């Protein structure tokens, strides 16, 4: 009865029927109605979450090889200490481990909400860091380390919100399942794809919340706080251009040089990419920010089809001989296509523009066009409400992200899937993802836990 006002407790002891009835209703509410559940002890919760994130980042769960045994053990232990029964699934020979945990909801007949995150992180160039990339030190109000932003910080937010929901006695409207995968950074073959292929019955969600999107006062438009919730992502079309020429001595230039043939093909392929047709979600983004976007690489990549020259390979011998003209040369191009763009037509257009029988264009990846999830759902509304509670003047909009995430494997099945990162980040911080000096602001990390908690206890 600690949540019942003192005056009413005294009335109940005196036996007043009305007071006793009020007490009974409130007491029942503590066990039946989420609105009457106690709030978490946030200072204690936040201190523990911060320490947990540091422990998590200190585990170098680098992919390759995606050995996530230690990371999975840490998260499993946290969940078990909170009264959950997580399950581990081994999906590969080198310690690739996935984790599932479930919090039952009020209506077990409804499909669950899936919280999706990943254990693995990309490799580091330790020499380029000014510190140990796995030390997880706190400096200048931020946690520094590989995986802090992508995506161990968000994973701890999801898990902490889930744990506090259970501790507060709040029963969500439907089951909530959390899935942590082992190899998001290698296209998910042993992670999300393996789980979907082998244990979809454990998932089968109504909605998915994953990484992607964020809030920023400068990323989308200068001086305006905008939160983007990812409702779709671009298709990944990786191409290899191979040129054939005539080998020769470097002292005697020839026209049929594979390197110059390749350079000309790259120029033709990339100088005039196919025109972009209007995409509804991009038009909605433009309206949300008032028609004017910031000019930066992230936004520019979101609004259009893009092509990046990523590798060049040529030469003869090891070490490569400078005085030998090679007979072959290769390049790879990372093409990212907007939803609805036909990848076959895009590739054919590139071949037609190159128009050189000495050059072949080979596809290295099969793009997945999963479409765009609706922003007119109860879950999207819950995310908007939770964000505006913390940031009343913010603009909340659906958006595309230029990169790929695990959620595409579920969106392709028609499941509404969202990239939801409830933190305000500047462009410099966002740029550290997969780069050097990766970090996450402590204040925003902790605020994100509260926002996630509000979303999970909503009606969706």
Which stretches of residues belong to each language-model region?
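Short, low-complexity intrinsically disordered segments enriched in A/P/G/S/L with frequent Arg
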Residues: 9, 13, 19-21
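Bacterial N-terminal signal peptides
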Residues: 21-34
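Metal-dependent amide/peptide-bond hydrolase catalytic core
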Residues: 37-38, 214-453, 459-460
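Acidic/His- and Gly-rich active-site-bordering loop/insert found
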Residues: 39-146, 165-174, 333
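Stable alpha-helical elements in mature extracytoplasmic
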Residues: 45-53, 68-71, 75, 154, ...
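Sec-exported extracytoplasmic/periplasmic mature domains
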Residues: 54-61, 76, 80-85, 163-167, ...
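Solvent-exposed loop/turn segments at secondary-structure junctions
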Residues: 62-64, 92-94, 106-108, 119-123, ...
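Acidic/histidine-rich catalytic neighborhood of metal-dependent amide-processing enzymes
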Residues: 143, 149-228
């Amino acid at each position: 009865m600690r949540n019942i006002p003192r005056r009413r407790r005294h009335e109940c002891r005196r036996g007043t029927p009305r007071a006793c009835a009020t007490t009974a209703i409130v007491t029942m509410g503590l066990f039946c109605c989420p609105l009457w559940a106690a709030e978490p002890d946030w200072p204690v919760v936040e201190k523990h979450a911060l320490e947990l994130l540091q422990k998590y980042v200190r585990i170098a769960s680098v992919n390759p090889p995606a050995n996530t045994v230690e990371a999975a053990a840490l998260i499993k232990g946290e969940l078990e200490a909170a009264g959950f029964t997580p399950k581990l699934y081994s999906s590969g020979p080198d310690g690739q481990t996935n984790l599932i945990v479930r919090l039952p909801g009020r209506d077990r007949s409804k499909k669950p909400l899936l919280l999706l995150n990943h254990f693995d992180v990309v490799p580091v160039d330790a020499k380029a860091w000014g510190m140990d990339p796995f030390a997880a030190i706190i400096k200048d109000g931020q946690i520094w380390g590989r995986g802090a932003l992508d995506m161990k910080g968000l994973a701890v937010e999801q898990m902490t919100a889930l744990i506090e929901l259970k501790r507060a006695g709040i029963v969500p409207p439907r089951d909530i399942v959390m899935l942590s995968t082992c190899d998001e950074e290698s296209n998910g073959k042993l992670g999300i794809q393996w789980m979907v292929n082998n244990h979809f019955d454990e998932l089968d969600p109504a909605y998915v919340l994953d990484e992607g999107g964020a809030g920023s006062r400068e990323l989308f438009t200068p001086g305006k706080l905008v939160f983007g919730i990812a409702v779709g992502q671009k298709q990944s079309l990786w191409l290899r251009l191979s040129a054939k020429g005539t080998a020769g001595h470097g002292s005697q230039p020839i026209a049929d040089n594979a390197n110059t043939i390749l350079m000309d093909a790259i120029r033709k392929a990339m100088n005039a990419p196919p025109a972009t047709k209007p995409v509804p979600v991009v038009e909605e983004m433009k309206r949300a920010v008032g028609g004017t976007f910031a000019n930066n690489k992230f936004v520019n990549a979101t609004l259009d089809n893009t092509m990046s020259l990523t590798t060049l390979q040529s030469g003869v011998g090891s070490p490569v001989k400078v005085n030998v003209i090679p007979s072959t040369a290769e390049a790879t191009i990372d093409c990212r296509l907007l939803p609805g763009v036909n990848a076959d037509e895009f590739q054919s257009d590139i071949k037609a523009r190159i128009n050189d029988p000495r050059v072949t264009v080979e596809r290295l990846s099969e793009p997945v066009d999963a479409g765009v999830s609706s922003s007119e759902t109860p879950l999207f509304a819950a995310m908007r409400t939770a964000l505006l509670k913390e940031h009343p003047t913010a603009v909340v909009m659906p958006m595309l992200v230029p990169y790929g995430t695990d959620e595409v494997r579920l969106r392709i099945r028609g499941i509404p899937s969202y990239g939801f990162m409830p933190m305000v980040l500047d462009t410099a911080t966002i740029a550290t993802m997969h780069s050097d000096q990766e970090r996450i602001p402590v204040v925003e990390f902790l605020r994100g836990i509260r926002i996630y908690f509000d979303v999970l206890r909503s009606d969706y």
